[in-house]
């Protein structure tokens, strides 16, 4: 029986495609700007918003998005001050979100069937509303990067130089922190809080092995992320294992394979160079 005839699998493929575009664009900024630890902190802090949403009856994704954005702003503001180190600010909001989420979940009466999907992801349960959220956020992100690619790229590579060029570095950083937080929350249905940061870093790390060009990294990350999702989805269906974890496992295997290929290429290049020098 053809698996593509199932609506839930079609939704999963579309969700994976939109997420690949979104994470490919935002993840390239994260890796280039070296914000992986901050993004990990925002990812886990978003659990506080999920807990508040479940406890109050508000949409957990909406609550998580608000909480994640505020956490990102908090980290950005505190780390800009000289009296608080960036890693300390990240750790504080990371643990704050997790503690608030745990307390709210325990205070919520009854069983919470959606909680595991937020923690570990459940891409096969993606619905129309999730696709609309991913689609709208993807369009917004593409529009922002199309209009402001050069200043964003300048801040990503060297914020000090960007500031010397009179670019609005603080505004760009807060804008990107907003998009990072929204992307993380929008990706929770894919792989969950535990693994969400992987979608924003591993395809970009793989792409970075072969190119340092910012635009090329974005496009390569999107393609690699999409391939990882397709292989991971199919493998999870065949093996009957969680799809989110399988997608991340595939992406790591692709990175390790690419790293090996790159190392062999460098070794052969050095060998050829030495042989030419001897001649």
PLM features per residue range, with description:
Residues 15-24, 45, 49, 53, ...:
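Alpha-helical transmembrane segments in multi-pass membrane proteins
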Residues 241-248, 252-279:
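Cytosolic-side transmembrane-helix boundaries in multi-pass membrane proteins
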Residues 1-21:
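Membrane-interfacial amphipathic/re-entrant helices at transmembrane-helix boundaries
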Residues 28-111, 207-219, 236-239, 263-264:
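Short loop segments and helix-boundary regions at transmembrane helix junctions
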Residues 13-18, 61-66, 91-92, 131-136, ...:
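Hydrophobic alpha-helical transmembrane segments
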Residues 194-245:
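Transmembrane alpha-helical segments in multi-pass inner-membrane proteins
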